[in-house]
Protein backbone atom coordinates (compact mmCIF):
# COMPACT_ATOMS: atom_id res chain seq x y z
CA UNK A 1 0.00 0.00 0.00
CA UNK A 2 1.45 3.36 -0.97
CA UNK A 3 1.36 6.45 1.26
CA UNK A 4 0.10 4.80 4.43
CA UNK A 5 -0.65 6.97 7.47
CA UNK A 6 0.65 4.98 10.44
CA UNK A 7 0.45 7.28 13.46
CA UNK A 8 -2.89 7.96 15.20
CA UNK A 9 -1.99 11.49 16.30
CA UNK A 10 0.31 12.77 13.57
CA UNK A 11 0.04 13.06 9.80
CA UNK A 12 3.08 10.86 9.26
CA UNK A 13 3.00 8.51 6.29
CA UNK A 14 5.17 5.71 5.00
CA UNK A 15 5.99 5.60 1.30
CA UNK A 16 4.86 1.95 1.19
CA UNK A 17 3.46 -0.28 3.92
CA UNK A 18 2.07 -3.70 4.70
CA UNK A 19 -0.12 -2.66 7.64
CA UNK A 20 -1.18 -6.18 8.65
CA UNK A 21 2.50 -7.02 9.33
CA UNK A 22 3.61 -3.52 10.38
CA UNK A 23 6.36 -3.49 7.75
CA UNK A 24 7.10 -0.27 5.88
CA UNK A 25 9.47 0.95 3.17
CA UNK A 26 10.72 4.52 3.11
CA UNK A 27 12.51 5.91 0.06
CA UNK A 28 15.30 8.23 1.20
CA UNK A 29 15.92 10.41 -1.83
CA UNK A 30 16.44 13.80 -0.23
CA UNK A 31 20.16 13.37 0.27
CA UNK A 32 20.68 13.26 -3.48
CA UNK A 33 18.32 15.94 -4.72
CA UNK A 34 18.78 18.63 -2.06
CA UNK A 35 15.55 17.74 -0.27
CA UNK A 36 14.56 18.53 3.28
CA UNK A 37 16.00 15.28 4.62
CA UNK A 38 19.55 16.62 4.51
CA UNK A 39 18.79 19.77 6.49
CA UNK A 40 19.16 19.44 10.27
CA UNK A 41 15.48 20.09 11.02
CA UNK A 42 14.34 17.61 8.34
CA UNK A 43 16.74 14.99 9.59
CA UNK A 44 15.51 15.48 13.17
CA UNK A 45 11.87 15.18 12.06
CA UNK A 46 12.70 11.94 10.25
CA UNK A 47 14.38 10.59 13.38
CA UNK A 48 11.28 11.42 15.43
CA UNK A 49 9.07 9.72 12.84
CA UNK A 50 11.16 6.54 12.72
CA UNK A 51 11.45 6.38 16.52
CA UNK A 52 7.68 6.73 16.90
CA UNK A 53 7.21 4.02 14.27
CA UNK A 54 9.49 1.69 16.24
CA UNK A 55 7.58 2.37 19.47
CA UNK A 56 4.36 1.49 17.64
CA UNK A 57 5.87 -1.82 16.50
CA UNK A 58 6.78 -1.00 12.90
CA UNK A 59 9.77 -2.42 11.03
CA UNK A 60 10.92 0.34 8.67
CA UNK A 61 13.19 -0.50 5.73
CA UNK A 62 14.93 2.56 4.33
CA UNK A 63 16.17 2.49 0.74
CA UNK A 64 17.53 4.86 -1.87
CA UNK A 65 15.36 5.58 -4.94
CA UNK A 66 17.49 3.35 -7.16
CA UNK A 67 17.14 0.45 -4.72
CA UNK A 68 13.35 0.43 -4.53
CA UNK A 69 12.81 -2.08 -7.34
CA UNK A 70 15.94 -4.13 -6.71
CA UNK A 71 15.84 -7.81 -5.76
CA UNK A 72 17.79 -7.12 -2.56
CA UNK A 73 15.02 -4.77 -1.39
CA UNK A 74 12.33 -7.32 -2.17
CA UNK A 75 14.29 -9.92 -0.19
CA UNK A 76 14.54 -7.53 2.77
CA UNK A 77 10.80 -6.90 2.69
CA UNK A 78 10.06 -10.63 2.49
CA UNK A 79 12.36 -11.33 5.44
CA UNK A 80 10.77 -8.52 7.43
CA UNK A 81 7.27 -9.85 6.73
CA UNK A 82 8.32 -13.38 7.71
CA UNK A 83 10.07 -12.31 10.92
CA UNK A 84 7.88 -9.45 12.13
CA UNK A 85 4.88 -10.54 14.14
Question: In which residue ranges do the predicted regions lie?
Answer:
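Nucleic-acid endo/exonuclease domains
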Residues: 1-85
Amino acid sequence: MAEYRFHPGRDWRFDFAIPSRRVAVEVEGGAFNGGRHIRPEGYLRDMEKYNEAAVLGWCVIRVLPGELLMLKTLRLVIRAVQNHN
